[in-house]
Every structure is written in structure tokens, then in C-alpha cells.
């Protein structure tokens, strides 16, 4: 919704978790769709996957670091966290594209 959230706020943690879970769900759906796809459709799915992985790479890395209790600097965490809206938007577009296939 365009609001700025503090990294250490509960609101941000909830938002981060939601975006991460949605992205993971769409990535899983995408992987299963690739298994069943025709060659032409498979290429489209690969493009969608590449875009999703690129948009969500920092968010996934941040989630992995938190899961593994690895310390990251505040600036790095902040930079990584700023990619959440882009990941969210790409996840939404990917989900819509999957629904349309």
C-alpha cells in the first residue's frame, strides 16, 4: 500500500513473512507447471521463474540468513529488505501469468 515500515517493526516482519510465503508458494506452483509443460510453454515458464528468482533473490537470502541465525549488517539487511515490494509485485505477476496459462 506504499507505506514505509521500520525494519524492526512487527508490521514489517509480518509483511516480509507474507511476501516470502507467497513467493515460495508461487515458485513451487511454477516448478510443478514446468514438469507438465509443453516445450513452448516450458520456455515461458522458465522466463517467469528467472524473473521471480531475480526479483526475490535478496529477500530469499535475508530469510535464509535469519533462518540460519547468521548476522548481517544493518545496512545490508536494509538494502535487502527494500526489495520486498519488487518481489511482491513480481510474485503477483507470475501468479497471474500462471493462472492465464
Q: Where do the PLM segments sit?
A:
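Long, amphipathic, charge-rich alpha-helical segments that form helical bundles/coiled-coils
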Residues: 41-94
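Acidic-enriched, low-complexity/disordered segments with a strong bias for Aspartate over Glutamate
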Residues: 1, 35-36, 50, 58, ...
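Immediate post-signal-peptide N-terminus of mature secreted/exported proteins
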Residues: 1-40
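Extended amphipathic alpha-helical scaffold segments
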Residues: 16-31, 53-63, 91-98
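Long, non-catalytic architectural segments outside compact domain cores
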Residues: 1-10, 82-85, 89, 93-101
Amino acid at each position: 500500500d506504499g507505506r514505509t515500515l521500520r525494519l524492526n517493526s512487527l508490521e514489517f516482519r509480518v509483511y516480509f513473512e507474507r511476501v516470502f510465503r507467497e513467493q515460495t508458494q508461487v515458485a513451487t506452483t511454477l516448478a510443478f507447471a514446468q514438469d507438465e509443460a509443453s516445450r513452448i510453454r516450458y520456455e515461458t515458464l522458465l522466463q517467469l521463474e528467472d524473473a521471480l528468482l531475480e526479483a526475490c533473490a535478496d529477500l530469499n537470502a535475508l530469510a535464509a540468513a535469519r533462518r540460519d541465525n547468521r548476522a548481517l549488517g544493518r545496512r545490508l539487511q536494509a538494502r535487502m529488505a527494500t526489495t520486498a515490494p519488487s518481489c511482491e509485485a513480481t510474485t503477483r505477476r507470475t501468479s497471474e501469468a500462471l493462472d492465464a496459462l
